[in-house]
Each structure stands twice: as structure tokens, then as C-alpha cells.
A protein has these predicted regions:
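Acidic, mature catalytic/reactive cores of soluble proteins
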Residues: 1-246
């Protein structure tokens, strides 16, 4: 039995190893400071948002959904503005993009993380990357020069690979539009398979893919105009964008 006076507190600790009681209060207060209080609707939303962020030895990822969905490059990029940028969390933003860019295979982001293995079957994820950089600039106030310094190499790899042609029969046609896939692949968000065959392969010229493609080209040109006017890619990307527009 312990008698407490008004304003006093007591810490109860249970564990498998003996700890120094002198550090309990400091550890408790540090943990309390790191938590988001549930004292408003906004704070409750922030707390719910951070529950989808997973920090592991391999890097920082985002769950696509509970209970069984793992991380997905497409869903991560789609969710970053709402879950991360709205709170101004630049640290988590950069951690998420570092994991995605560190685990790229050619111009592709991993679209599925399952049993410690990565799968790369999405044509749109690399293009969503450009829209996320636009949101990064818009919502956190970074400059185009900063965007290019941090992510210019990845931007170039994606655009040039798609222009020259790459895996999954992805290629730029004479009219500038982006062609992707074959009858045995499902490279867009409509990627349900049955008996080894995609229900909706959507081979060819998908409207939302080409909208993202055009946006990526135009945004990259805007960034280069401010960050590196002497870069020869600016003419190539602008020429392809003009063909798409025509």
C-alpha cells in the first residue's frame, strides 16, 4: 500500500530484466512527448495516419491497409500527401522516398512487398513519383532546384527508360504516347488475376497512364528550366511532351 499526496505520481514497471528506477521518469516523459495526444479530431487523424508507417531495419515503408495488405509502391505514393505532407513531416517523406528509390529495379518501384520479397509490376508508380514531387514542392515549400538536387537522377532514369523502351513492353510511340503491357500482364491498378491470367490486362494506351506520363514530362521540363538549363534532356523531354499534346 502506498499513500500519495495530491500532485504526486507513481510508476509501475514490469519486465524481464532489472532496470534502474532513476531513469523511469525520464523514459516515461520522453515516450509521452513522442506520442500524438488524442485531444482533438485533428490529432486523432494524425495518430491514425502514423499507424500506417513502418520503420524497420530495411527502411521506412507504408502499409497499404490492415490487416493483411503489405506495403505497395503505388499506394505509398498515392497516400504520401494525405498521411505525411499535410502534417509537414519532411523527415518521414524523405525516409519513404529513400526506401522506394533504394529498392528500385531499373525505372520501377516495388509494387508489392510479400514475405521479404519485392515485386515490380506497375507502370504507373514511377509516374506517380513526379506528382508526389510536385506536392512536395507545393506543400512543403521546397524549390525546384532542391527537387532536382535530391531526385533529379531518379527522374531522369524513369523518363529516359520509358522513352527508350524498357521491361513489360513499355515504350514511347511516335505520337509520344506511352504504350505498356501484353495480354499476360496487368500493369495498372486493375491487376486482379484468375488462374494465372489477368482479368483486365489493359494492354496498350491507358488514359490515366498517359495523363501521368504527360504530367511527368512537363513537370520535369519545368524543374530543369530552373535547376539545370544546360541539361540536354530538357529538349528531349519537351519534344516528347509536345508530341503527346499534338
Amino acid at each position: 500500500e502506498v499513500n500519495l499526496k495530491e500532485g504526486e505520481s507513481i510508476i509501475v514497471s514490469a519486465g524481464l530484466e532489472e532496470k534502474s528506477p532513476a531513469s523511469f521518469k525520464r523514459q516515461f516523459e520522453a515516450l509521452l512527448d513522442s506520442r500524438i495526444p488524442r485531444d482533438s479530431f485533428e490529432h486523432c487523424l494524425q495518430n491514425s495516419a502514423q499507424q500506417f508507417i513502418i520503420r524497420e531495419k530495411e527502411g521506412t515503408r507504408m502499409f497499404a491497409g490492415f490487416p493483411w495488405f503489405g506495403s505497395c509502391g503505388r499506394d505509398t505514393l498515392l497516400s504520401i500527401p494525405g498521411l505525411v505532407l499535410t502534417t509537414g513531416d519532411k523527415k518521414t517523406f524523405k525516409e519513404l522516398l529513400k526506401y522506394l528509390t533504394d529498392t528500385m529495379k531499373g525505372p520501377f518501384f516495388s509494387n508489392r512487398y510479400y514475405q521479404k520479397s519485392l515485386y515490380y509490376t506497375a507502370v504507373d508508380s514511377p509516374l506517380w513519383f513526379f506528382l508526389i514531387l510536385q506536392k512536395y514542392e507545393e506543400m512543403l515549400g521546397v524549390s525546384k532546384k532542391t527537387v532536382w538536387k535530391e531526385y533529379g537522377e531518379v527522374m531522369s532514369k524513369i523518363l529516359n527508360s520509358f522513352i527508350e523502351g524498357t521491361d513489360f513492353n513499355i515504350k514511347t510511340l511516335d505520337n509520344g504516347l506511352l504504350y505498356a503491357g501484353n495480354e499476360n500482364l496487368a500493369l495498372t491498378w486493375m491487376n486482379v488475376f484468375c488462374e494465372g491470367k489477368p482479368y483486365t490486362p489493359r494492354t496498350g494506351l491507358n488514359i490515366e497512364i498517359n495523363a501521368l506520363w504527360y504530367n511527368a514530362l512537363r513537370y520535369a521540363v519545368e524543374v530543369l528550366k530552373e535547376a539545370d538549363k544546360k541539361n540536354t534532356d530538357i529538349e528531349k523531354w519537351n519534344e516528347v511532351a509536345n508530341r503527346v499534346e499534338a
